[in-house]
Amino acid sequence: FSYADADGKFSGIDVDVCRGVAAAVFGDDTKVKYTPLTAKERFTALQSGEVDLLSRNTTWTSSRDAGMGMAFTGVTYYDGIGFLTHDKAGLKSAKELDGATVCIQAGTDTELNVADYF
């Protein structure tokens, strides 16, 4: 939920969270160094101390909460899973998509949740 514009200035809700923490901890919301990370890099960067705070899309699971040596501070964004189809399909339930080809980002909790659903 953040991006860097053409000038390299970061914006978005994740950036706002980081600025809020910097303001609370350092008294200055500009005392932030943004480090773009992929989903694969994020936990290693936090565990190694490369970053002090991870503010990005990360599903709070019991295995992550208990087994990764990190502390989730609270939910900043709550989402769900939905399916978008053409209205001509006439579907009344997501269950009618069983056996259909569904586009999902690989390696995400959403992928696992959808596989469990069907």
Question: Locations of the language-model features?
Answer:
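Acidic, polar ligand-binding/catalytic clefts
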Residues: 19, 23, 27, 31-96
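Short coil/turn segments
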Residues: 6-8, 59-60, 86-90, 102-110
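Short, well-ordered beta-strand elements
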Residues: 10-11, 32-35, 99-103
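Short, well-ordered beta-strand segments
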Residues: 2, 54, 84, 101-103
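Histidine/lysine/aspartate-rich catalytic loop segments that bind and position anionic ligands
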Residues: 76-82, 107-118
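Short glycine-rich His-centered loop
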Residues: 1-13
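Ligand-binding cleft/hinge of the Venus flytrap
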Residues: 4-7, 19-30, 110-118
